Amino acid sequence: MTHPKILLRQASATIFSALLPCLGGHAQDRCQAFNLETLPKREVRAVWLTTLSNLDWPKGYATTQEGIERQKRQLTEILDRYAEANINTVLFQARVRATTTYPSALEPWDRCLTGQEGRAPGYDPLRFAIEECHKRGMELHAWLATIPCGPWTSLGCRRLRAKGLRLRKLDGAGYLDPSDERVAPYLASVCAELTEKYDIDGIHLDYIRYPDGWPRATRRNGDTPDYRRANINRIVRAIHEAVETRKPWVKVSASPLGKYSDLTHYSSHGYNARDKVYQDAQLWLKQGWMEQLYPMQYYRGNHYFPFVPDWVANSHGRTLASGLGTWFLDPREGRWTLADISRQMEVSRWAGMGHAHFRSKFLIENHKGIYDFEQRFNLFPALVPAMKGKRDDRLAPPTDLRLDSGLISWQGDAPYYNIYVSDHWPVDTDNPANLLLARFAHKQIATALAPRLFRGWPFVAVTAMDRYGNESQPLQYQPPVATTYQPQLPKNLYLANDGQQLDLSEALRPLLPMDIDRYAVATLQGVFLRSYLRPLQATGPAQRIDISSLANGVYWVYAHNKRTKKMVRVGSFEIDRQQVGFVR
């Protein structure tokens, strides 16, 4: 029998070799023509929203009612931008440096909200953020910086020392000592308070490690690398147990260093999670102490790509999201190109990982076009992967699905519902192109809020979803006209092609000045096959897209309006390569 470690190495090598076509100099050209058949229905699409030093939010202090409203408005504008890009997970910094952005019985307020440590802002920012994320179908994970405690003289740091916890001073800042056996239960109590008080979807642990600059393990008095890993493991396990016993659907995750350890053919160059900062992150997944990992893969080239399959091969069936160094797109921070990030997003998706941007500011400010790319990359909504091995046995499909007087309604006891629409019946709920609304917390919606309905998308299906992310079987709605409904292909919408290229100029003429940023091709049954960026030559007779990879048959063509965020069907075409020249 082959040893399990050999099988893992073989799996890693297979994945890495399959990724090679996307790693060359022209990878962006090859990888941006997204194959819509491979778009995942489930995937983490996350952003770290930093409150430390007001880096992402808030901008301005809440010392008056006007200041409170300004902070709320800023946050909702950020969340709207996330929703428009089909982001589904917000990592909201709730514990900053032994200080909080929520009212806590254990730790003081952070200064980012009012400009003063320990001063309440007059509202609960975390509760507000949770409510606003949930309105938009997004999860909110409370992001905690675990070991760092801020400047040595700061209020949070002084409070921890007053509690009797052991801290070490490094470069003027305080850090909890992981070897102090009181640290694990204390941090677990912080997470327990959060879990009990708030409807959070996850606890996200940052800096769950020995800090850079900590004295090296001397091996004296038992201070060995294994001892240090055991100290961090003790904290992780205590937090997991505190959360699991209260709300088992709350996902515990962490952001370890982006390289777990040295690989057979690729070195971590002395900086990795396991051996440098004592994060045995792959063990956390194996033991079930973590449901998700967000490795901070803030590297390029051979410092990034070989380590993707290593994480995947050792995920133990749990969820991974590649942490992206999006801030390096800012010329003041680094010299990364859009292709550096877009290749990583393509490769991590192909390997089965989601992605997370560090940090919010650089994504929504669209540095080098990264926000535009994010919108194209996330063409459809996606569900967060279901938790491994957990399910609510009471989960049942919704009932009594009705469409009356411009209102879609149904009955059920689930906390969330997913709504699918299509121009084909029954609606294929495995196809992400049909997902209209994810993680919807109500039992009715006005069709005016779902513009695809009754505009060529007459069929509806609804599934129930439990807190663990599991879906029920769909409840399908078939209008009375469904038995006779067939897509009609008006003659004036047939588009010319030669089996290799499709001419779009005629179809787009009546739509100009429509702000089109991409096209898509679908089967007549509504299954999207490929997406294309807008051709470089945006006007004139050369408005063509490559259809050489499509089989003979008849297809729909859609154009995406960047301004209105809607897909518009612009025509159909038939591929018949037995004919010569452009055909209709």
Model regions: which residues?
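Active-site-adjacent "subsite" loops/lids of carbohydrate-active enzymes
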Residues: R42-V44, T50-K72, H141-E193, K197
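Catalytic domains of carbohydrate-active enzymes, especially glycoside hydrolases
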Residues: R73-T99, Y198
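Active-site neighborhood of glycoside hydrolase catalytic domains
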Residues: S189-V190, E196-P306, D310, N314-G317
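Substrate-binding cleft of secreted/luminal carbohydrate-active enzymes
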Residues: A281-Q282, W289-N302, A321-G389
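Conserved aromatic anchor
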Residues: G406-A414
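Beta-strand-rich modules
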Residues: P451-E471
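Extracellular fibronectin type III
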Residues: R467-T484
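C-terminal tail/sorting-segment detector
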Residues: Y485-K491, L504, N552-R584
